[in-house]
Amino acid sequence: MNILLQDPFAVLKEHPEKLTHTIENPLRTECLQFSPCGDYLALGCANGALVIYDMDTFRPICVPGNMLGAHVRPITSIAWSPDGRLLLTSSRDWSIKLWDLSKPSKPLKEIRFDSPIWGCQWLDAKRRLCVATIFEESDAYVIDFSNDPVASLLSKSDEKQLSSTPDHGYVLVCTVHTKHPNIIIVGTSKGWLDFYKFHSLYQTECIHSLKITSSNIKHLIVSQNGERLAINCSDRTIRQYEISIDDENSAVELTLEHKYQDVINKLQWNCILFSNNTAEYLVASTHGSSAHELYIWETTSGTLVRVLEGAEEELIDINWDFYSMSIVSNGFESGNVYVWSVVIPPKWSALAPDFEEVEENVDYLEKEDEFDEVDEAEQQQGLEQEEEIAIDLRTREQYDVRGNNLLVERFTIPTDYTRIIKMQSS
């Protein structure tokens, strides 16, 4: 049913509540990522395969790399370009690959390192720049895929600053600021948080450095409006900061807002994710064989508002489609993908105002004038008045009822039938 005809209180729910689907992936999911508009879900698998599912049918439609060139070890991260045409994948096979989904048979470009890749994110998709973290490296790498792939260390440019800086440990995670795309945030194995200002491939500047914990920083996320930063650490605590960057991108100010912990079970957290826009909610997956839930907190008050249940195993990666308001997470043991969605009951009275649901059949009583003949002249006059109303069937609405932009560019992925049949038969 058209979403505009649904119950507005159900449509505008800010987070899903019920497990609605389970996607069985025979190749065992390691990581996952929605396309920018939520039309597709990319799954990185344990054998190095990349499988893309259509979220309308919950069926695979594309397996990039059917003419060699696919990863040969588990995929560690996936990143979509804003238009949904390009994909970045990193893997434990020491390589990062760039895929053009209009020609998915083999990677468009790739670059290899000397150790496994922790993760990779877009820095500027238009210029084909990305940033990656490598196993047991003290600095992140900026990679340029515009021509022949080139990698450069994201290091402190000032030697005096470098000599006076204590050991930060190995770089584990990184993210790019959503409102200041030239600001790169890096987390290390010794709890340091470093902010870099990117000028060019060979020129970077460390503008702020702060030690927030003595343990590993496992995950960094920035809200869509750029005002909140959440940090998942191995000390069983998720820290939420208000982040402020000046107009010249030269100074950073962090203010601690909340700390999220499971004070009863002392659980660690596998993955964290903000909701859209102002990040009113924060969702996290729990670590441990006995923990099978996703926790959702309200970021303003720091209170737990929802626990998503239904999975029968530990959950790892998380992603949130804000168009359909669905959350997905992959299971640790089976590799299946669990989908939580907003369940909207059909509101048929929107189509027929006198519609009423009944629990059992009732005898219909005909009204006295229900089937009386209508004067043809009056009927014709009413039809003419209705025909005079102009109906625009071409102009698309810019925003849906949740405020998501409907006019963003979307790429349609061609279906790869042959590879899908081989995957399902394996």
From Swiss-Prot:
Stored PROSITE patterns: WD_REPEATS_1, WD_REPEATS_2, WD_REPEATS_REGION
Keywords of the record: Chromosome, Nucleus, Repeat, Telomere, WD repeat
Identification of the protein by name: COMPASS component SWD1
Segments annotated as WD repeats: 24-63, 70-109, 212-251, 264-307, 310-350
InterPro entries the UniProt entry points to: RBBP5/Swd1 (IPR037850), WD40/YVTN_repeat-like_dom_sf (IPR015943), WD40_repeat_CS (IPR019775), WD40_repeat_dom_sf (IPR036322), WD40_rpt (IPR001680)
Keyword hit for Nucleus: yes
A biological-process GO annotation: subtelomeric heterochromatin formation
A family per Pfam: WD40
GO cellular component, one term: nucleus
Keyword Repeat annotated: yes
PANTHER family linked: RETINOBLASTOMA-BINDING PROTEIN 5
Additional record remark: Present with 907 molecules/cell in log phase SD medium.
Annotated function: Component of the Set1C/COMPASS complex that specifically mono-, di- and trimethylates histone H3 to form H3K4me1/2/3, which subsequently plays a role in telomere length maintenance and transcription elongation regulation. COMPASS recognizes ubiquitinated H2B on one face of the nucleosome which stimulates the methylation of H3 on the opposing face. SWD1/CPS50 acts as an assembly and regulatory hub for COMPASS complex formation. Serves as a highly utilized surface for COMPASS interaction with the nucleosome.
Major localization listed first in the record, in broad terms: nucleus
Signal peptide: none
Domain of life, source organism: Eukaryota
Location in the cell: Nucleus; Chromosome, Telomere
Complex and partners: Component of the Set1C/COMPASS complex which consists of SET1(2), BRE2(2), SPP1(2), SDC1(1), SHG1(1), SWD1(1), SWD2(1), and SWD3(1).
Record: residues binding DNA: R236, K266
